[in-house]
Amino acid sequence: MIIPADIHTHCQPEVPGEAIVNCFPETFVPQLEGWYSVGIHPWYITSSTVSLAEKKRCLEELLYHPQVLAMGEAGLDKLADASLPLQREVFEYQARLAEETDKPLVIHLVKAVDELLKLKQKIRPVKPWIIHGFRGKAVLAEEYLRHGFHLSFGERYQEEALRIVPSDRLFLETDESMTSIDTLYERAAMISKSPSGELRETVRKNVEEIFFRR
């Protein structure tokens, strides 16, 4: 079994299983031996020909699929078309469903930090919440860490933020970037002043612990 080094991408990897591919629940078609996350993205709550009810129905079925490792992207985005109250409702639905199905939650967040922290306090999840594509400053990273979040870094981020994240709360991802995950590991290792192989092994253990152990 391959443990993916890349926890969030929108592209199928050359070797199935090397990355967790993010999919919409209504269009999910898995590759043999691939790994996936599925969720209702805040951008597409209302801007889709598929109804929200149908998306929820598909999602509830897919979270029991053996190749689906995580819920997400779920999130809050003040630049999205859907109203913030509706986004909060859909996010809370997905967060509670992640708890019911024993899945970590991969989070898309834009300009809604306070709202997210309030929801975490309300829901009090047991399963990890992971901020994907974190680009904030170190002070924001510290706040997330105090509230128990994990952080995933992509191609662009604040170097000091990466440096302060404890090794057991760290992930790397390509998201929509064409930069290889190997290059991202090499850069992160240089920034954190740790050998690239050691960093990969640390993140591999994190992935195994968070995404595979039930």
Question: Can you say where each PLM-predicted feature lies in the sequence?
Answer:
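Mid-domain alpha/beta scaffold segments of enzyme catalytic cores
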Residues: M1-R214
